């Protein structure tokens, strides 16, 4: 299939995943529609498919009211927060040491300063959780304030660092209702410390389900290449580059492999949950493949690959010399592919942690994306170049066929 034809299909898939489906957040109807669309399409290309499911929550919110006497304050519900209606005195803490010395079970607690300099990792996040974050969460749950207000500034290290204010909590396992506000609003509010205040969070957690989509071909699945792209999107973001782009590359690749009859196993996985607080799809895949990662010849992760600026960058992790040579030789034939810097925040970490060779593919300008576009409303279809998605699908097809020749 010609690159031009693939580009046209890529544009139509982009419209489907980002416009016709308004949200792909885990647990939403849009997320379920996206995985159903992916599963049906890859099955039509002759792949055997399965869709292992997991329980999760969707979330709905209808705003926040926060007032002290006649003064009102702008605040936003923390993603996945429980709702509440509270009237209680305002307490304030700026450090863990201050919090440890306080009794706040009767109060609404305003967090500011050092306690809110960076977003706290979800309490049950399995792959990374620093002790400093765990200490803050443990203190909050022990002290048990009736609700929490977080005054945050800018976290330049956070993905989507241009978002201001940022939510201190994004955690459906943390059950103290919470909101967040700007540093300036926090400075206004702190002058009312000790006074009674009213807070209403109109929000609801909704039990739901999501699922991964796993598509397989090849005579020998016990020796296979696994290709990941996470299909979910961050709440509030169209998720065009992150990661409709990677999902579309897998769909184009599946069509290019419609007639594949090789020995090497090929496993295409639309992983569901990379942008969700507990990574349920990743955890489900790890559990299902426990003791079987030795079968993986190469793990490939495709994320944020379609940005219209710059080229597409690849990086290698613990690849045998022969596999690395094949990757570099294949990529060198495509002018929009360049070898880039290593990065470890994506789903290729599942292969690395299981000591398997990995290939990560993303934008050459990933830092630019993460600094102001990724996880934000700016991640729209207009920033994605469909020709890059077509090129990458063709390059991956060539790579898989060469790896199959080596396996035969």
Model-derived regions, located:
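Acidic/histidine-rich catalytic neighborhood of metal-dependent amide-processing enzymes
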Residues: 156, 166, 175, 209-212, ...
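Soluble metallo-hydrolase cores and metallopeptidase-like ectodomains found primarily
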Residues: 68-101, 161-240, 252-259, 263-265, ...
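Extracellular/luminal Protease-associated
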Residues: 75-170, 175
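N-terminal capping segment at the start of a domain
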Residues: 2-29, 45, 52-53, 155, ...
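Second-shell loop/turn segments in exported
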Residues: 1-4, 20-29, 92, 121-131, ...
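Active-site-adjacent substrate-binding region
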Residues: 147, 168-171, 308-408
């Amino acid at each position: 299939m010609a690159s031009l034809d693939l580009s046209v299909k890529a544009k139509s898939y982009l419209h489907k995943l980002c416009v016709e489906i308004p949200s792909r957040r885990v647990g939403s109807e849009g997320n379920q529609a996206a995985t159903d669309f992916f599963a049906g399409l890859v099955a039509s290309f002759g792949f055997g498919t399965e869709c292992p499911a997991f329980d999760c929550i969707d979330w709905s919110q209808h705003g926040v009211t926060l007032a002290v006497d006649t003064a009102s304050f702008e605040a936003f519900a923390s993603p996945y927060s429980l709702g509440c209606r509270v009237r209680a005195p305002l307490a304030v803490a700026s450090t863990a040491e201050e919090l440890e010395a306080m009794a706040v079970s009767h109060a609404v607690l305003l967090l500011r300063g050092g306690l809110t300099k960076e977003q706290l990792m979800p309490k049950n996040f399995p792959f990374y959780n620093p002790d400093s974050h765990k200490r803050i969460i443990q203190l909050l749950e022990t002290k048990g304030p009736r609700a929490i207000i977080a005054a945050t500034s800018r976290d330049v290290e956070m993905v989507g660092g241009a978002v201001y204010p940022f939510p201190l909590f994004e955690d459906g396992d943390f059950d103290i209702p919470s909101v967040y506000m700007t540093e300036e609003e926090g400075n206004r509010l702190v002058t009312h410390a000790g006074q009674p205040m009213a807070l209403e969070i109109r929000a609801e957690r909704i039990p739901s389900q999501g699922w991964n989509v796993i598509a397989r071909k090849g005579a020998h699945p016990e020796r296979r290449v696994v290709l990941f792209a996470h299909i979910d999107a961050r709440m509030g973001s169209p998720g065009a580059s992150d990661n409709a782009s990677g999902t579309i590359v897998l769909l184009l690749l599946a069509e290019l492999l419609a007639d594949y009859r090789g020995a090497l196993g090929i496993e295409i996985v639309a992983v569901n949950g990379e942008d969700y607080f507990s990574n349920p799809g990743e955890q489900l895949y790890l559990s299902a493949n426990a003791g079987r990662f030795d079968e993986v010849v190469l793990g490939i992760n495709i994320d944020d690959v379609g940005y219209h600026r710059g080229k597409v960058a690849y990086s290698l992790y613990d690849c045998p010399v022969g596999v690395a040579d094949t990757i570099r030789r294949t990529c060198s034939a495509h002018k929009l592919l360049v070898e880039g810097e290593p990065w470890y925040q994506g789903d290729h970490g599942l292969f690395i942690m299981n000591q398997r060779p990995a290939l990560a593919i993303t934008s050459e300008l990933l830092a630019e994306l993460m600094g102001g576009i990724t996880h934000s409303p700016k991640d729209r279809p207009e920033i994605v170049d469909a020709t890059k998605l077509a090129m990458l699908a063709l390059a991956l097809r060539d790579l898989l066929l060469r790896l199959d020749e080596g396996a035969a």
